[in-house]
Amino acid sequence: QLKSNLYANGTYIYKQLVKEKKKAKAADVNLYRDTLYNIYDKWFENFGQCNKTKVSLAKDIIYVNDQKNFPKAYALYKEVVENEPAIITSTDVKYYFVYTGMYMLKTGKIECEEFLSNYEALSAICENNIAQGKKVEKFNNVQNILDKKLGETPCASCDKLEEIYSAKYNNDPENMD
């Protein structure tokens, strides 16, 4: 009988090994990274596509700074934010927006409209947790980071915001959200 926490332990061990190998500039770092991803593949194969495991994989992609897989981490986070936002932590909010979201925007893989939509969804998660008294300081801090990072993008220009929100308003003038 397989136990899912064996996979959690395995990913933790290999994540640490990847970090050590990268620090030592070892030639075999990719082998360890591939093994980390293989553990996730087996985890999904044996226990299904659980949202918590998707978030864990996304977080580990960022933790090992595997930028070629940032689009995958972005897609995993996006799916979980849409389907089960209650499990998203303050760290997840930061990783999704600051690392993968900024990467996707800078590389032209997403447009400002999607970036701003992500900002709104993640801000709502922060606000919800703050209102419920859950890790208020952490969510306040990450909201400040979101605001700062948004301001560093071309998406925060008055012209761009007016263009996006005018179109939304014109499509549905009764909905002011």
Region locations from a protein language model:
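Preference for long, solvent-exposed alpha-helical segments and helix-linker "stalks"
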Residues: 1-177
